[in-house]
Amino acid sequence: MADELIVVGGGAAGMMAAISAAETGAAVRLLERNPKVGRKLYITGKGRCNVTNHCPPEEVLASTPRNGRFLYGAVTRTPPAWVEDFFTGLGVPLK
C-alpha cells in the first residue's frame, strides 16, 4: 500500500509539495478551502501566472519589502531553470 499524505493548503507551496509527493508514489490528498487551488498564482504577471523570476537572488531579497532574508534558502536553492523544468516536466507550457 502506498504512503498516504494530506497536504493542507493549495497555494504554490502546497501544490508543489503534493505533486512532489505524488511523484514518489504517495497517495496524496490536497485540501484547499477556496474553490480553486493556486488562486494567488492566477493574479501574478497580469494573469499569466508568473512561476519564477530571473533576477539575481540578491535583487530578489533586496526587493522584498519586509525581512527578505527569510526567502534566502528558497531563492538560492531553487534557481529559475529548476522551476521551469519542474513545470515543463508536468506538461505546463511556459512563455
Task: Label each region the model flagged.
Residues 3-30:
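N-terminal Rossmann-like FAD-binding beta1-loop-alpha1 element of flavoenzymes
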Residues 35-95:
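Conserved N-terminal/central alpha/beta ligand/cofactor-binding core
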Residues 2-3, 88:
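A general secondary-structure boundary signal
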